[in-house]
Swiss-Prot record:
Interacts with several SH3 domain-containing proteins and with poly-ubiquitinated proteins. It comes from Xenopus laevis. Residues 181-253 are annotated as: EF-hand-like. It is found in: Cytoplasm. Residues 1-19 have a biased composition (Low complexity). Keywords: Calcium, Cytoplasm, Immunity, Metal-binding, Repeat, Transferase, Ubl conjugation pathway, Zinc, Zinc-finger. Pathway: Protein modification; protein ubiquitination. A zinc finger (RING-type) spans 386-425. Residues 485-498 have a biased composition (Polar residues). Residues 48-356 form the Cbl-PTB domain. It catalyses: S-ubiquitinyl-[E2 ubiquitin-conjugating enzyme]-L-cysteine + [acceptor protein]-L-lysine = [E2 ubiquitin-conjugating enzyme]-L-cysteine + N(6)-ubiquitinyl-[acceptor protein]-L-lysine. This is E3 ubiquitin-protein ligase CBL-B-B. The lineage of its organism: Eukaryota, Metazoa, Chordata, Craniata, Vertebrata.
Amino acid sequence: MASSSSSSSNSSTSSSALSGRLPGARSANPRKARILGLFDAIQDAVGPPKQAAADRRTVEKTWKLMDKVVRLCQNPKLQLKNSPPYILDILPDTYQHLRLILSKYDDNQKLAQLSENEYFKIYIDSLMKKSKRAIRLFKEGKERMYEEQSQERRNLTKLSLIFSHMLAEIKAIFPSGQFQGDTFRITKADAAEFWRKFFGERTIVPWKIFRQCLHEVQQISSGLEAMALKSTIDLTCNDYISVFEFDIFARLFQPWSSILRNWNFLAVTHPGYMAFLTYDEVKARLQKYSLKHGSYIFRLSCTRLGQWAIGYVTAGGNILQTIPHNKPLFQALIDGSREGFYLYPDGRSYNPDLTDLCEPTPHDHIKVTQEQYELYCEMGSTFQLCKICAENDKDVKIEPCGHLMCTSCLTSWQESDGQGCPFCRCEIKGTEPIIVDPFDPRDENRCCSFNDSLCTPMFDFDDDDLREECLIMNRLASLRKMNERQNSPVTSPGSSPLLQRRKTPPDPVQIPHLNLPPVPPRLDLIQRGLARSPCASPTGSPKSSPCMARKQDKPLPAPPPPLREPPPPPERPPPIPPDSRTCRHLHHAENVPCRDQSTPNEAWCTRDLSGGNQPSVCRVTHDGSPKLGVSSSVLNGRHSRVSTEAGFMRHKHHKRRESPLETHRVYNGLSGNEEYDVPPRLSPPPPTITIHPTVICPLLANSASDKVRNSAEEDDSEYKIPSSHPVSSRLPLHCHSIKHFPRLCENGQCLSNGAHNGISEIKN
């Protein structure tokens, strides 16, 4: 008797769970089931009721309903395909995550907080309703559930998608079982600002409230449009909009400034949009267009929420599906249409024109702070340089983590199936183009920008003022560079624009290692001003910053002390008699004498670069260029590096890559043939040496070498400038012949036009 009563109560409870309503209702009656389904739809349209507390008992009841759905879907007659969304994987994963959440809130106090959590209450209630709906679907559909093309089977697939969305949402709001909905990071900054402004730290809001707030920012034209919008945003179909669903909507129909316009074009009027469609259903739908190359449809990706999946028919009749990365959907469709992939939406001949959605998006500017500048200087790098390839400038920001890199590295990472951000492994939900504005210590105290300078009169300067003259040259060079970039077919800049900053050229007295003109008058001021201009160097990589032409394998110099005046230059040493020195001149058509730089002498002498005990032995290579044997000199406690001009060989132990086009360096307004971590102090110039291109005097070379060695040991604390002694072309008569190598003269430096296929050492 007791067993019969127990069985009757169990059957009554079971029927109550299946029907979802009155305990006395009979689920076997299809008419009543349809009425109850209509009642559910009306209640959903009216609005959600007040949620009860989601205590442990309620959660366990939901588990039982989920378990029943799993057992119904395990029927072999269904022949469910193991492809997303696979309900036999989704519901067990949901169950495991709920168990994880309860384990994190095991004591009574924490469990009470969890049961009163607004989002958790709504989630458990929605999960229970969806489970009951799935059970009722099996009860109503009966044998039609086993037909793949039936409407009941289609409804089961839609429920599977909803369960999949709910699983992704609970994992995002409760990562590792801990509630973090109040700190959830919305990917797009402007969308996040909207949510914070209207909803603060709330995790979920009713649809009616969300609609009113959205209408204040972007107008919703009609109630019909509002219903269609709700069906797009409300992925879990519970009449609430969570911060997770809002983030996905903002990513799908970006940018936020025109999000409703984009949504109307792509989801309302576009014939290629398919809502709640799976991978297999896309293939089945496009199968009838297998002979029509270019047919396509697109849907929300169920495995990567927030991204689109586009299915299309190839020229060979195959059906492929792809997920576009790092670009909005309308841009992907426009590009695919130009390339002949996306021509016929859902097989139709009319392909909507989406070019109206293409509006120039302003790039976010990231200003490098002084602390970042100094930190990266100590590491021998720059903030704007991509830390993965060390070649290109950072031009893209990963969202929501905010890490920066160059586009080529991000594309390569994603094509290699890299998961998440390469730096922090955070999920890549989106990207934004950015421009890094380098820090310039010379412009630190200036508020005017390059745009402001264009509006001010530029010709109120003194012709004798070198600073102002070079400043004008810099501006003209910047304008020319900017015009070249505007005429370039490349639309998206990969580096900082020239409009953002203006650099005053450095005082030539503060840069003693620049090539000085040999004799007055100084007609080369314009050329030298352009060469020193950070924006005028033509040797930078196309992908690098136009105001930061550099070689990637060398560190940036440390920031110079502000407002430090250099000491006055000392008097030049008296000229050395011609009979006690040797000279070298260049042999070319015009027989133009070169500037008496110390580099030719260093090619065959021993010197101490730092004034320490570690000499650096130089030798002449086959092309006549000097090559250091040992380089361990230190300038101000930091290692210096050897010149890497186009006519010079690289240092032995320096094996990083460098662009072959870069022959000139610009660092924070300082340019020169050698690079230092701080502005260098040059030793007094060695005696000028004259050597015929085909003969050399070894005896005089020894004496000259001693003089150079003695001059290098002088006190380097005083400020030195290069010498400009006259060049002697007289030759001693008693000299030994050596092999001649053809040489060129460029900017006062001796360059070889031969190949690096041998080494010729000059012996004393």
